[in-house]
């Protein structure tokens, strides 16, 4: 059994430390109030049993809470008072040096919490450590100086989650849709260097990767680009190559048809070379965030402005999917699944039915998904129904990064819809499980507590908004001055972009399943519990609309992915309420509105059921189905894609893509338990060295490849197949 020290280091559990601490507290009181050696040993044993029952590494603070409770249970009030006083004095000492120990432990690679925090960061690398060091300082400043103490306390206790406090000290926003079209067509500036409109497709792609890196270094959330914005440069290259071929063939007896063949062959070669940087540079770039950019590439034929551009876009999409299917090579030279870029493919009327002109692209996408877990899929049909602007027109567009969707918006200056160049200000998430447990199952109390917690989230969201107010465009020129998000003047404040629907701000939620299960005794898939689940969703939407109307800001409801926070929430719930069977007996809580990962339900029923809840998450959400190896059953994959097209706006298929560098095993790397800790192990050779294992799993929208904390690992282990 392990214990997590205050600096984040994970060490073996030592019962003698409990015995020593209680003995010192007991010796501080006189006479009959002192405990016998047997009583002290019993207390230590009881605490040890409680820790083992949690089936995870516990923190020092949790152990001390358990000791206090044991002392109070046996009426040892004087000893408990001395124990609590000692804790308080030590706490005051620590407050004089709030970050030193944590920073030193992460530099020495001893901080287990940091090691497991982000599935796409390697905390042993210097550049990542620098980001984490800055993050520790930011979190400390946020907690001590920048945030309302009530919000800080609620965050620490797991009532809410104030996202990305490791970046809150700076004036940074969350995620966005990069206006690559504006930057490529009208030029941009990168690091003080003017970049003019590119004269070839490959150059456009190279510039795009530089833009991606610059944008990622100036925000903390994901970004999305569209391949449509690169499509015009295919014809630029075609004409350039055609002129070169004409010059080469001048005076030779070469037919026009033969010349066209040569042009198309060279053009295809350039498209291949152009797409490669988007794949390879993105996964090898290191931004100031200490990781590869969280980039999503959008593939939507319906965005093309004319027939030629659509045909050229199809070529780019085909090449992008082919390269992703191939993968990237690991250190051993073996092709593996990369985490980025995330790919989103739009299912539409001319690519979803056999015989459609672009059906071959959907078949290729299905083949790639079966092997590499991407692309994910948006249904144009369903999105046009759900994303309707004030003029009654439906729109299809990509999410910002993983799942955060903008609200429909009509530019008041042009009267046209606008999506690229818009962004999200930030997220605060409510823990629905805590609301339910705090109510004790009383519905009247539930709604009262729910409103109190939502009001707290609202205040926290206002703090995020106020942190951006007054930000000069000079803070991030690539974003605010040179086209990624706007073309503001130097020194101009970004304030006008924070109101009127141009940007969004998100109320996140997590644990709907556990919330409903506790209040009704049933899963929200049960007909008797579903109405309550929908009423919870509607209530949060009503609050967002109320705040939006009062403040002229686009509050929207967001299905929080909870990559590492799922573990934090679970630990906080266990601390506050103990082990409640079926509710807090796991080291994770369920993402957003999802069906519980262990619930047996088929893929089609799951997608249909969750589509009703996705509709009520306008600020972002994604559904998934867990599938076995489908590489030899692409017909089944295509049937799922057809179902997605007809029934749900945004969904993905999860499979497994692993490799053991020690023995060459390329099947599923298993999760096994060792002394109360979940570890990854090759079932063929027993290798547990994470540096010699390539494991790719869907974390929560993105693919993770750097392993996960104990809560998320348990959630991955508990997943059942839906197909």
Regions inferred by a protein language model and the residue ranges of each:
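Non-cofactor substrate-recognition interfaces
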Residues: 13-15, 421, 696
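Conserved catalytic cores of very large enzyme subunits
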Residues: 89-501, 522, 526-688, 694
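Long insertion/accessory domains within large nucleic-acid-processing enzymes
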Residues: 684-723
